[in-house]
A protein has these predicted regions:
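Short, structured beta-strand/loop micro-motifs enriched in basic residues and often containing a Trp
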Residues: 67-76
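N-terminal signal peptide c-region/cleavage motif recognized by signal peptidases
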Residues: 14-16
């Protein structure tokens, strides 16, 4: 009986964990680039969020929210809590939500006006931070 309960819970919770980490809500075949003003960097787990206000093609303000990596994942890519200043101009590259009515995306990277780029999940090999070779 105990082994059946353990099996049930393992199967049940593995589905929940998989759903949480699913990227099904995002169009992974499409990239969008949003230029705007950084209004929030939500530095928290399980995912950090970058919030940018941009102007749409009709001249209306649009607030975009981009889901990033965990804090540890961002730090491995060179991010810190103070990598950006609220109010600075940035360009965000992301995978859009499959629902075009949603101003929400999966973050690829953020580029500052200086040209410095911060990657969320992965980065080109030539720009990877050096690792201690001990």
């Amino acid at each position: 009986m105990n082994s059946k309960c353990v099996l049930f819970f393992c199967l049940f919770f593995s589905g929940i964990a998989n759903a949480h980490h699913s990227r099904a809500a995002f169009d992974l075949e499409t990239n969008i680039e949003i230029e705007g003003t950084l209004v929030e960097l939500a530095w928290r787990n399980p995912h950090a969020y970058v919030v940018v206000e941009s102007i749409d093609e009709k001249g209306n303000p649009v607030v975009w929210t981009f889901e990033g990596h965990s804090i540890a994942g961002l730090m491995r890519n060179g991010w810190t809590r103070s990598s950006f200043e609220i109010g600075e101009r940035v360009v965000v590259d992301a995978r859009p939500n499959r629902d075009p009515e949603q101003s929400f995306g999966l973050l690829n990277y953020v580029t500052r006006a200086s040209g410095e780029t911060f990657y969320a999940f992965s980065q080109p090999q030539e720009s990877a931070p050096p690792h201690d070779a001990r």
